[in-house]
Amino acid sequence: MLVLTRKLKEVIQIGDDIEITVLAIQGDQVKLGINAPKHVEIHRKEIYLAIQAENNAASLASKTSLEQLNEQLKHWKGGKQA
């Protein structure tokens, strides 16, 4: 992990396209401004983890739904052929 010290209004550059600016420091909080291209997703860690959990849950639900649909189709085909 790279650790940097910055003062108010100072900037960290990441690659060619991303800038992080220290906008304010109040007590134990630091306010950051982030300039990045629109295609770069930026989230707080807790939001990112919540999104990942939702995506995983949706993926599992979709798989279960598809498996149930497949079973129903098998029964339907079996009833038609008999």
UniProtKB/Swiss-Prot annotation:
Gene3D superfamilies: Translational regulator CsrA. Keywords: Bacterial flagellum biogenesis, Cytoplasm, Repressor, RNA-binding, Translation regulation. This is Translational regulator CsrA. One of its GO terms (cellular component) is cytosol. Its main location: cytoplasm. Homodimer; the beta-strands of each monomer intercalate to form a hydrophobic core, while the alpha-helices form wings that extend away from the core. SUPFAM superfamilies: CsrA-like (SSF117130). The keyword RNA-binding applies. Belongs to the CsrA/RsmA family. It is found in: Cytoplasm. A translational regulator that binds mRNA to regulate translation initiation and/or mRNA stability. Usually binds in the 5'-UTR at or near the Shine-Dalgarno sequence preventing ribosome-binding, thus repressing translation. Its main target seems to be the major flagellin gene, while its function is anatagonized by FliW. One of its GO terms (molecular function) is mRNA 5'-UTR binding. GO terms for biological process: bacterial-type flagellum organization; mRNA catabolic process; negative regulation of translational initiation; regulation of bacterial-type flagellum assembly; regulation of carbohydrate metabolic process. Pfam families: CsrA.
